[in-house]
Amino acid sequence: MAYVNFGEDNQLPFNIIKMIGIDEVMSQNKLFNVITCYGAGLKYMDVDTRQPTTHPEIKRWLIHNSLPLFQLEQATDMKYFFFCVSVIILSRDGKRINRLIHKEACYCRFQQARRGKINHVIYANFRENASLRPEDYEVIRLLDPRDPLGDLMVLMGREPGRDGETRARTDDRKFAILVRFPTPGFQYYPIPYYTSIFRGDWYDIKRLIGKGKKAKLR
């Protein structure tokens, strides 16, 4: 299955991680942004009491899916790459969401769009362009980013599509959900605004100043 490279050599996300990691200010700024985005964490509130739910089934689902970790993972990818991917796994009868899983954005690639729509997310270890076998790729059906719930309802045969027809329920039970922060040009992979730092001169100058001072101390 053909996918779109993430950067010219398909290594852009790993290069971004490296460039942020070697800058002590930027890396701490990213941590601050993620923690701020996390805030007080996710809470499922009861509509009537306006307090965190005490419903045993809901509480069990929240615990088994580790929502605090999920939120931190999603926030981290959003702050680094301006997009994040999650996967929902339905029950066998297709009536419930059993699992909610985060997928690392740096290992996600998008299938080439057909008629303006991306139909699948490809998940694999693309680091250093490692040699991958067909079984190393996880191909996940992507729900419509603008209306994932509506798309899921149509695929499960619970609502008619835009053509007014109700389809037979799909056999798929695993679906990807994509959230992208809007950037000019609407590329496959957003170009975060902060990456202008790397395209300017001061990122390199700042590092050279540190190296120069270090050399004088020797």
Predicted feature descriptions by range:
Residues M1-I22, V34-C37, G41-R218:
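Structured, contiguous alpha/beta core segments that scaffold functional sites
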